[in-house]
């Protein structure tokens, strides 16, 4: 039986309108058991200032971002289910959902799925990796009942 342990930290000045802890749990449970039976993840919801500071410190990018992934790397002789931390910026997620004409809850789900795949070692640095990661994300999002996250909901195609 698979188990996903979530440590949800809300560090936003305004927590009104955020997805529920149950939402975050459901999204993680759609991803992590596909790869390992027991997983522990911290999700920290932050405002733009914290996202900006972390993005500058760890990625050298002078702006806030939607999701940052910090994988936990234990020494090889120690087996721990701790995957790492996801830092998700509320304002960036909300702004992107509007700009990309996506349902807000679907975009939140996509950020959790996307960030979780990064914790599992997936990346999108080159085209082949990006294509593989996007296919996995799209399949998981469909399983959750959401549309393809790489197509705008109002896209005429």
Curated annotation (Swiss-Prot):
Keywords, ordered alphabetically: Cytoplasm, Endonuclease, Hydrolase, Metal-binding, Nuclease, Ribosome biogenesis, rRNA processing, Zinc
Molecular functions (GO terms): metalloendopeptidase activity; RNA endonuclease activity; zinc ion binding
Keyword rRNA processing: yes
Binding site for Zn(2+): 114, 118, 124
A single cellular component GO annotation: cytoplasm
Recorded superkingdom: Bacteria
InterPro entries with a match to the protein in the record: MetalPrtase_cat_dom_sf_prd, YbeY, YbeY_CS
Enzyme class, UniProt record, top EC level: hydrolase
Necessary cofactors: Zn(2+)
GO biological process terms on file: rRNA processing
Record's subcellular location: Cytoplasm
EC number: 3.1.-.-
Cofactor remark: Binds 1 zinc ion.
Role noted for this protein: Single strand-specific metallo-endoribonuclease involved in late-stage 70S ribosome quality control and in maturation of the 3' terminus of the 16S rRNA.
NCBIfam families registered for this protein in UniProt: rRNA maturation RNase YbeY
Family in the record: Belongs to the endoribonuclease YbeY family.
Name used for this protein in its record: Endoribonuclease YbeY
